Design a protein with these regions (language model features):
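N-terminal export/assembly segments and adjacent metallocofactor-ligating motifs
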Residues: 1-290, 308, 314, 319, ...
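Long, contiguous, secondary-structure-rich segments that constitute the structural scaffold
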Residues: 7-32, 527-586, 670-686, 690-770
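N-terminal leader/propeptide and maturation segments of large enzyme subunits in energy/redox metabolism
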Residues: 125-132, 285, 290-328, 404-429, ...
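Flexible, glycine/charged-enriched surface loops at secondary-structure junctions
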Residues: 153-157, 293-298, 345, 376-383, ...
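Conserved short loop/turn motifs at secondary-structure junctions
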Residues: 159-167, 323-326, 349-356, 388, ...
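Extended redox/cofactor-interaction regions of prokaryotic respiratory oxidoreductases
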Residues: 172-254, 277-281, 369-492, 501-508, ...
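Flexible glycine/proline-enriched surface loops and loop-helix/loop-strand junctions
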Residues: 224, 264-265, 315-318, 347-352, ...
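Short beta-alpha connecting loops at secondary-structure transitions
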Residues: 263-271, 499-501, 505, 515-527
Length: 770
């Protein structure tokens, strides 16, 4: 086998981490005579001013593509010079962001230039050090080590953990190569950490994982209910869409903390943590008792309402008030607000999903939408907001815990269908589901899984209860990490590191929260020997000996055609999309978009998307995806919190996004000097002012936060925005998950990151000095 050669050099662009300037530094900065453009200004002063820019930053062409950070899926104009991206601006008429971008989007290109990019394969040597190697050795080592583990311990002894941040085509190829070619039964994505509860909730209630909305619904609602999400910080462009709403909507925020979003709400329900389910059952009970429900819709389009109505009778207002901390008067006011709204939309994100009862909580919101008929119309819906840029693509096409295109591994007809479409034997397709993420971790702890392949995610930072996660990685016989950076907490512990291209350095598609398929383009060259994930998967298939199975998967565009065929007849059917060019011309296209019928079946014309598509919502026809076309009311009694506060650990820790400028584990965003300066670099903990006074804690004092699993040191942020008895630490810091408690929703197996008991106290003078 020949080695892979490359003549791409790595630019040396080392960044220096600086503190935010004080007044003196700022004055010096403003008066300095030597900056990055000083020479250009002196030599060619006539080229500056009146909007002119120096030649090296002047574009000669522009293209547009979708952002690679969150699930909003904004359109960005990327300005090119000599075929390489030099800067970007938001697309003014892209139907998602309408000319807006958050700080992360503005900095999307700059994070590609970091000096810790993975530029060549690295293999751990006999001294335990990661040392450069060639691609031939790297690919051969991958094959030989994983095959040896399978031969000794069985096929199920190796697994992979994937992501929601590579292209859909890459996800599909990865899952297919691993499961159909390499016999890796077990593979899951980090989307398990953010969206699994919403997926299960939708599947059980609607019959398919189908977020029903379009972003235009933010602007068409007259009542907007936001649950467990701080849109101002986590999804700022979505908050901008709400701000554009011309109907002066009532905005109800359900969140224990007085977040930036809660401050802007017309009603803030500062509930007791994890009392959401009780709250929504109580609201349903009031709506039913007052007759504020859509009986016609319920009778014609749903099942199991009578049992649900009987269930919520167990949640009278006085008991709900006692459990949630929301007084009866406010409960009735919220119910009346929902009743009076003509277009009511219910939105939720991680505060619901990342819970030990996330599925049922999400379904309690779906129940409210169904019983009031607020679905399938503009400005309505039970709407889950996704986290990662391509979590929706992962949910449908990653071939991890579900067969490609929303099919089922355990369904023989589905296996035969996919095998026929891929021209492979159905025997190659597993007839059982993968272990979910937490069970893969458990399998490693029990010695059942010996080899792990991690792609574009950082579990050593992000997985719940880091002490357990670190123990897991140390028990592996072989760990492969495939990433664009060599410095992630997980990559540094790899036995083999495969350098990957990032967003903007490859092609493919993403699917955003509103089901919009958007285009990813190659506008920059990956550094060194880094390759696209698609290319790496193809090479690994070749080295493994299963490359012929994927001979039709020649490139992302060809793979998109394969996925179109797989989607046919499914709720996510997008066979009506002609090609990448049409996606580009239309400003993205939402699924479903089936191909135009022909012949006798052409009674109804297909949707016309020849011009720019603004948005389409699901269930306008009142038909759901269960066999009988009806939606289901699903419910059960709330569970007790697994680890409530105690005498030793009297505070409840919540985690979440702390800044609009940082993203997940900061793998990319920490590379931007601008983004670093927009967020606290030191770990901080929010604590209520009364609690701080009682504990003797002052603002900015260093404190110790401790749980049963670990302890961290942080700076205290004393505030009234968090209620007494609760503390908050942002998820972006590596130490945060040293505290969290590993427990999971029983249906989705999604981790519950937002509830564990901790203590907090100031550091002693001796501890501070050391």
């Amino acid at each position: 086998m020949s080695t892979i050669e490359t003549d791409i050099d790595v630019a040396d662009e080392t960044e220096v981490v600086e503190q935010s300037p004080d007044r003196g530094q700022l004055s010096s900065l403003l008066l300095q005579r030597d900056g990055v453009l000083t020479k250009d200004l002196l030599l060619t002063p006539g080229k500056f001013g009146l909007g002119k820019v120096p030649a090296k930053t002047r574009p000669d062409s522009t293209t547009n593509m979708v952002c690679g950070f969150c699930s909003t899926g904004c359109g960005l104009n990327v300005h090119l010079a000599r075929g390489e991206a030099i800067n970007l601006t938001p697309v003014t008429d892209y139907p998602v962001n309408l000319g807006m971008a958050c700080p992360k989007g503005w900095e999307a290109l700059n994070v590609l230039k970091a000096d810790d990019r993975a530029t060549e394969p690295l293999l751990r040597d006999s001294r335990g050090k990661l040392a450069p190697t060639d691609w031939n050795t790297a690919l051969s080592t991958f094959r030989d080590r994983f095959k040896a583990i399978q031969q000794q311990h069985g096929d199920d002894s190796v697994a992979f953990i994937s992501t929601g941040q590579i292209a859909t085509e890459e996800m599909a190829l990865l899952g297919s190569v691993a499961k159909f070619g390499m016999n890796m039964l077990h593979g899951d994505g980090n989307t398990r950490q953010c969206m699994a509860s919403a997926v299960v909730a939708y599947k059980q209630a609607f019959g398919f994982d189908a977020p029903p909305y379009t972003y235009a619904d933010f602007e068409e609602s007259d009542v907007i209910v936001l649950v467990g999400g701080n849109l101002c910080i986590a999804h700022p462009i979505m908050w901008q869409r709400i701000s554009r709403n011309p109907h002066n909507p009532e905005i109800i925020v359900v969140d224990p903390r007085r977040t930036e979003t809660a401050m802007a709400a017309t009603q803030h329900l500062a509930i007791e943590p994890k009392s959401d389910l009780t709250l929504f059952y109580g609201l349903a009970n009031i709506l039913i008792e007052r007759g504020w429900i859509d009986r016609e819709f319920i009778q014609q389009h749903t099942n199991d309402f009578d049992a649900f109505a009987e269930h919520v009778r167990q949640f009278p207002p006085h008991e709900v008030a006692a459990a949630t901390g929301i007084d009866e008067e406010q409960l009735h006011r919220v119910a009346e607000t929902i009743h009076q709204g003509r277009r009511v939309s219910f939105w939720w994100t991680m505060g619901v999903n990342q819970s030990y009862e996330g599925v049922r909580t999400a379904q309690s919101l779906i129940n409210l939408a169904l019983m009031t008929g607020n679905i399938g119309r503009p400005g309505t819906g039970a709407n889950s907001i996704t986290g990662q840029c391509n979590a929706m693509g992962s949910r449908l096409f990653s071939n991890t815990t579900g067969l490609l295109g929303g099919h089922d591994f355990e369904n023989a007809e589905h296996r035969e269908k996919i095998a026929g479409l891929l021209n492979i034997s159905a025997e190659r397709i597993p007839d059982r589901n993968s272990l979910p993420y937490d069970r893969i971790i458990e399998g490693i702890l029990r010695g059942k899984i010996k080899g792990l392949w991690v792609i574009a995610t950082n579990p050593f930072h992000s997985w719940i209860n880091q002490n357990m996660a670190r123990d897991v990685l140390e028990r592996l016989d072989f760990l492969v990490v495939q990433d664009m950076y060599r410095s992630t907490e997980t990559a540094e512990r790899a036995d083999l590191l495969l350098p990957a291209a990032g967003w903007g350095e490859k092609e493919g598609t993403f699917i955003n929260s509103e089901r919009r398929i958007g285009l990813l383009k190659k506008v920059a060259t990956a550094p060194g020997q880094a390759l696209s994930d698609f290319r790496i998967f193809k090479l690994l298939a070749h080295y493994w000996g299963c490359g012929e199975m994927f001979s039709q998967w020649t490139d992302p565009a060809a793979t998109f055609e394969i996925l179109k065929r797989i989607s046919k007849g499914q709720p996510c059917d997008f066979t009506g999309i002609r090609d990448y060019r049409q996606i580009d011309e239309c400003g993205g296209i939402q699924w479903p978009l089936p191909e135009a019928p022909s012949g006798d079946d052409a009674a109804e014309p297909a949707t016309d998307v020849t011009t720019q598509e603004q948005g389409r919502r699901l269930f306008a026809d009142r038909k759901f995806y269960h066999a009988d076309g009806r939606a289901k009311f699903i419910f059960e009694m709330p569970r007790k919190m697994p680890e409530p506060p105690s005498k030793k650990f009297p505070y409840l820790l919540m985690t979440g996004r702390g800044s609009a400028s940082q993203w997940h584990t900061q793998t990319r965003t920490a590379k931007s000097k601008v983004l670093r300066q927009l967020a606290p670099r030191s770990v901080y903990v929010e604590i209520n002012a009364d609690d701080a006074r009682r504990e003797g804690i002052r603002t900015n004092a260093r404190v110790r936060v401790e749980s049963q699993r670990g302890r961290i040191v942080a700076k205290a942020f004393v505030t009234r925005t968090i209620p007494p008895g609760q503390v908050f630490v942002a998820m972006h810091y590596e130490v945060t998950n040293q505290l969290t408690h590993a427990h999971f929703d029983p249906y989705s197996r999604q981790p519950s990151y937002k509830d564990c008991a901790v203590s907090i106290r100031p550091l002693s003078s001796h501890e501070v000095s050391h």
